[in-house]
Amino acid sequence: MTYLEKVGEGSGRLALKYKFNWKTVVVIILVSILSMAGKVYYEWVNRVIPEELLPQAIERTTSVKSYRYHVGLKLKVNGDDRLLSKVKGERQNGQFHLQGEIAGQEVDVIYVNNKVYMKDAVSGRWMVNHGGDIFQQDLFMIEVNPVASLEYEALNNINYLGIEKGKVDAYVMEYTPVVVNQMLATYWRNFKYKVWIEKRFKRIFKLEVFADHKDVPQNGLHMQLILYDFNKKLNIQAPSTQ
């Protein structure tokens, strides 16, 4: 056998050894297609349409039966930040309990069955006021029912900022609303809202608000709100006045 014949015979055996495997190719193609289809489906299911998600999240948040919260309001006056209020509270079916500081005064207030119970900071005793009209005033609206600050007439300039990973994964958005809250609308303008929306339940659990004073634009308002324990059964009871 000549050298060329030996080479030809060896090449033939090599070709048979590495025969093209169509089954493997088909499997690879199918896996690629399924992977791509899964990715497309995932993106479709998790797609975010800000103009639809934001009003839905606001509606779901403002319609809860109960919640707990932390809220802080700061005023910016001549470049300096001044604390207006910092309270924590809980609210259920129109009844509430809040504790903290408002306008430099320590407060501990419970509102149950149209009665306001206010704890005296000096004696520690509870005083009762029949009729809760004082807490219908605009001054206390944010501290008493902070989700009311989410109510709006229009939502403008909605900007989706993406997903923020954390203890609670959240959709993050910014927008400029036309607010209906009387306290906010009376004294402030040029509102800028930033919200964190629970990815799972589509409710707002964190809110940040900036606004300019109507008469003195260089002065501003900064509000921070944390919401949690949505629709939990809360135990808000009247304290002993003895």
Model-derived segments and spans:
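Beta-turn initiation residues at beta-strand->coil junctions
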Residues: L73-L75, G100-A103, D120-V122, E208-H213
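N-terminal leader/targeting segments and the immediate start of mature chains
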Residues: T2-Q95, K232-Q242
